[in-house]
């Protein structure tokens, strides 16, 4: 059972990022991917074998790219970092975040509430702005099926169970 999260209001996110000059966008290819696949009716994951979790996370990568393009068009410099399960990080993941941080005045987190807390704990001395992009609403049980192309999985909406808190 994963955490079910939805995107926060687009205007709220744009307002929060208004004063940012350089953004580090951290995304998670875990529960956020399934949540975005369900919420936005996007392909979930590539079915091709041999891809790592980030490369196969179609929905979260599509949403991340859309936001990077939007923020870049606003004159922001945006770098991205994918961390697999920031809710339960290894030291190497923490080090990757800390080494990517210099030069960024804003961190945007495209992940669930648990990931936000985990990343926030690492950044306790960070003086910049931290913006959660998603809001966790509960948990989910999803059945994944092949999409129309046969190349991706997608969430079967008819059998989806979302347990809202």
What is each stretch, according to the model?
Residues 1-165:
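Iron-sulfur-associated redox domains of electron-transfer enzymes in respiratory
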């Amino acid at each position: 059972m994963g955490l079910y999260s939805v995107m926060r209001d687009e205007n709220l996110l744009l307002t929060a990022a208004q004063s940012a000059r350089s953004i580090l966008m951290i995304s998670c290819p875990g529960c956020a991917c399934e949540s975005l696949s369900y919420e936005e009716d996007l392909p979930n994951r590539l079915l091709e074998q041999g891809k790592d979790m980030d490369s196969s996370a179609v929905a979260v990568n599509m949403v991340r790219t859309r936001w990077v393009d939007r923020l870049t068009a606003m004159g922001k410099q945006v770098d991205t970092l994918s961390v697999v399960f920031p809710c339960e990080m290894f030291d190497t993941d923490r080090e990757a975040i800390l080494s990517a941080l210099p030069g960024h005045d804003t961190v945007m987190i495209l992940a669930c509430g648990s990931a936000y807390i985990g990343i926030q704990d690492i950044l306790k001395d960070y003086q910049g702005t931290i913006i959660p992009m998603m809001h966790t609403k509960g948990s989910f049980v999803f059945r994944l099926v092949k999409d129309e192309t046969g190349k991706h999985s997608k969430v079967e909406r008819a059998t989806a169970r979302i347990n809202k808190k």
